[in-house]
UniProtKB/Swiss-Prot annotation:
Consequence of substituting H201P: Partial loss of transport activity
Biological classification of the source: Eukaryota, Metazoa, Chordata, Craniata, Vertebrata
Spans traversing the lipid bilayer: 37-57, 70-89, 116-136, 156-176, 185-205, 232-252
Key word Cell cycle present: no
Name this polypeptide is given: Aquaporin-4
Keyword Magnesium: no
Cytoplasmic compartment segments: 1-36, 90-93, 102-115, 177-184, 253-323
Entry's free-text remark on domains: Aquaporins contain two tandem repeats each containing three membrane-spanning domains and a pore-forming loop with the signature motif Asn-Pro-Ala (NPA).
Effect of C17A: Reduced palmitoylation. Loss of palmitoylation
Gene, per the UniProt record: Aqp4
PANTHER family: AQUAPORIN TRANSPORTER, AQUAPORIN-4
Keywords on record: Cell membrane, Cell projection, Endosome, Glycoprotein, Lipoprotein, Membrane, Palmitate, Phosphoprotein, Repeat, Transmembrane, Transmembrane helix, Transport
Length: 323
């Protein structure tokens, strides 16, 4: 295709992958706060996998295995995630779980661009955490290194449903605990999330290993090369997380003010001339405004033809993007 034909095809705005389009989509990537958040997700996942998966090691070895201590494993996973959320929640939001990140994208709390970096960091952290655990564990007791597997008497469909259910209750707890509209939450949000993880393990360890976290399953699977039914630990948790986030955000506790602002935003977007686009932002927190969170408090319109910016601001309460 000639340059002239390409220009006519894409119009004045240029192709969707133009340098300007990419710069706008990933504008928050160039900030220090953004990379601190991504690094926090990486480090939190590394520590979480190292500590929690370490509790699954059977020190009796394959010849004389010890009974599985479900309470020990459940408490270790729950307290580990609570500790990481408490440590890193104010830096990155403390997702520490790709399923939670996807749920945040679907409820417009972060952008797709930011989620890509978060999920990548989470998966890398899980791999390195599992690798360190493998390195420091005697070969005679490594076993499966905590690889999550479906019980032999269950089908893949059963495993998928169990992972969906336990992740649903986890993410619903996250959204409910972090709802800034609530005035009755006085306890520790991190501890509430930790208890939710522990409950999921107490119920589902014997069913599927109780993942609730695709990265937690991904790290040990990479190190051990065991991919049996691995897709379950991505599909189940992500579906459960999206359902929980959507039900809480749009059905049980919808934000009336947010709906009004979005309606105004789309109305203004419809009135813009061809060659303009609109994105929704918020100016609530200086820690967050420099990165890629999708925020509904500000209507930000850039006219590509004129190269100027127009902003229509509206006051809003804080929407917590935590965990």
């Amino acid at each position: 295709m000639s340059d002239g034909a390409a220009a006519r095809r894409w119009g004045k705005c240029g192709p969707p992958c133009s340098r300007e389009s990419i710069m706008v989509a990933f504008k928050g990537v160039w900030t220090q706060a953004f990379w601190k958040a991504v690094t926090a997700e990486f480090l939190a996942m590394l520590i979480f996998v190292l500590l929690s998966v370490g509790s699954t090691i059977n020190w009796g070895g394959s010849e004389n295995p010890l009974p599985v201590d479900m309470v020990l494993i459940s408490l270790c996973f729950g307290l580990s995630i609570a500790t990481m959320v408490q440590c890193f929640g104010h830096i990155s939001g403390g997702h520490i779980n790709p399923a939670v990140t996807v749920a945040m994208v679907c409820t417009r709390k972060i952008s797709i661009a930011k989620s890509v970096f978060y999920i990548t960091a989470q998966c890398l952290g899980a791999i390195i955490g599992a690798g360190i655990l493998y390195l420091v564990t005697p070969p005679s007791v490594v076993g499966g290194l905590g690889v999550t597997t479906v019980h032999g008497n269950l089908t893949a469909g059963h495993g998928l449903l169990v992972e969906l259910i336990i992740t649903f209750q986890l993410v619903f707890t996250i959204f409910a605990s972090c709802d800034s509209k609530r005035t009755d939450v006085t306890g520790s949000v991190a501890l509430a999330i930790g208890f939710s993880v522990a409950i999921g393990h107490l119920f589902a360890i014997n069913y599927t290993g109780a993942s609730m976290n695709p990265a937690r399953s991904f790290g040990p699977a990479v190190i051990m090369g065991n991919w049996e039914n691995h897709w379950i630990y991505w599909v189940g948790p992500i579906i459960g997380a999206v359902l929980a986030g959507a039900l809480y955000e749009y059905v049980f506790c919808p934000d009336v003010e947010l709906k009004r602002r979005l309606k105004e935003a789309f109305s203004k977007a419809a009135q813009q001339t061809k060659g303009s686009y609109m994105e929704v932002e918020d100016n609530r927190s200086q820690v967050e405004t420099e990165d890629l969170i999708l925020k509904p408090g500000v209507v930000h319109v850039i006219d590509i033809d004129r190269g100027d910016e127009k902003k229509g601001k509206d006051s809003s309460g804080e929407v917590l993007s935590s965990v």
